[in-house]
Amino acid sequence: MLGHRLLPSLDFPAVSEGYKPEHDMSPNKDASSLNSSAAGLVCLPPVSEELQLVWTQAIQTSELDGNEHLLQAFSYFPYPSLADIALLCLRHGLQMEKVKTWFMAQRLRCGISWSSEEIEETRARVVYHRDQLLFKSLLSFTQQSVRPPQERPPVLRPEQVALGLSPLAPSEQPTHMKGLKVEPEEPSQVSQLPLNHQNAKEPLMMGSRTFSHQSDCQDLQISGLSKEQAGRGPDQSCGKTASWNHFTAVHQPDKPASVSLLDNSCKEESEPSGIPPSSSTSSPSFQALANGTTATPKPLQPLGCISQSLSPSKKALSPQVEPLWPQRLWNNSEPNSAGPTEYLSPDMQHQRKTKRKTKEQLAILKSFFLQCQWARREDYHKLEQITGLPRPEIIQWFGDTRYALKHGQLKWFRDNAVLGTPSFQDPAIPTPSTRSLKEWAKTPPLPAPPPPPDIRPLEKYWAAHQQLQEADILKLSQASRLSTQQVLDWFDSRLPKPAEVVVCLDEEDEEDEEDELPEDGEEEEEEEEDDDDGDDDVIIWD
């Protein structure tokens, strides 16, 4: 008897493939929405404890739906830690087991199924935006508008337009479903659902801010929520509708078969749709998702297959439909189009150009990582003060280092790790080697780097005087933050180079010297002749 009231587990195809109710996904429902019997039991899959199943009463999963504090916590992050749940219970007088059960039920209602690694990665990204409720679109704090749901005009999603789907008439729209229970009387429906678990990770179309207050739950019925929602932009959150097509074909038997044939005929045309490629880093995309605004779609008309005259880059969108993502994220590949071609804004491009960390900064980060691999918010704040690095770079460094450690690529950690400490810590298990915040508070911050030299005072002085005075050397050295020798060298480089002097001997001087040499020789010859004459004058008498 209990088998008729079971919710599918985490690995059940109905949940893992984006199985969602047709209309009402809001947690503000009666207890009977999960189970028609108050004494019925449901099976909830937790995150930890090796995915063991939790059995609980169906009424406990919805009795806290009116608690605004829990709705606020779920809007901030759908996977709160045990410490966050305990703090909620202490502040608002709640029972911890009921709160944990409530969060499990909300994740199932919204089709959320993340792994533990994805939870930690997304939590590290959401920590920058503590004031923004990124998951508020899944909840509804206000009641539906006065107009009944059956009188509202059906709204087409871009996926429906790309596949040529027409809106359903009020008589053709499916009825409300009672929770997420699966009746065993229809095993063929469950077996026809896709078996690929990766389709459960389709991101939610969060581009429009009207989800949380004005739009009905039909806007959320064709999309699931995954951790890529916080790290990827809205430009990547459309274009895949396999799970929705299966859901439409299985759970709408009264719908004409022409729609299914139309889906198959248009599938080949919608595959080469020009969806902008994702960027290599997730932090800029996350900011674009959190801060970006989107265009409101215009009223649509029933459309068939898109004509072949459209370019392949625009087959996924009709000319009458405005895209749900910002136009600056759309890469228009046609040469004649006038749209922007850059994905990233100047702020995002500036964030990519991060400076290299100094040896002192890396030493402080490594010393903390050796003690604790999962830093808290207070630790990030203190490390930000000590190292002078921005918090996003610190958190990114911790994430990359944990990834390298998990895959055995961290040699310095193995060389310096304390004996007896595990190679990879579980963030939920505190260790005695964790360094407390008081110890880190004693660490003095790194000295600020000296400012770069400024030669503008030297240029002004040179333009005014054109010569360096010895009395002004010290003053110029202080103003330019250069040493006195550097100031002298700078002014020496400005002085004009001395002219080269070439000494040339005149030809007249050379001739005079040549004339003097023969005169000396003639005097010597005259002296020799005089000596000879003296010898001839000697007379010998006998």
Swiss-Prot record:
Ubiquitous. Strongly expressed in testis. Residues 55-114, 349-409, 443-502 bind DNA. There is a cross-link at K181, K201 (Glycyl lysine isopeptide (Lys-Gly) (interchain with G-Cter in SUMO2)). The modification Phosphoserine is found at S345. Keywords: DNA-binding, Homeobox, Isopeptide bond, Nucleus, Phosphoprotein, Repeat, Transcription, Transcription regulation, Ubl conjugation. Residues 165-193, 250-307, 424-454, 501-542 are annotated as: Disordered. Residues 444-454 have a biased composition (Pro residues). One of its GO terms (molecular function) is DNA binding. The keyword Ubl conjugation applies. SUPFAM superfamilies: Homeodomain-like. A motif (Nuclear localization signal) lies at residues 352-357. Residues 286-296 have a biased composition (Polar residues). Disulfide bonds: none annotated. The modification Phosphothreonine is found at T443. Residues 272-285 have a biased composition (Low complexity). Residues 505-542 have a biased composition (Acidic residues). It is found in: Nucleus. Its main location: nucleus. InterPro entries: HD, Homeodomain-like_sf, Homez_homeobox_dom. GO terms for cellular component: nucleus. CDD domains: homeodomain (cd00086). May function as a transcriptional regulator. Homodimer or heterodimer (Potential). Interacts with HOXC8. This is Homeobox and leucine zipper protein Homez. It comes from Mus musculus (Mouse).
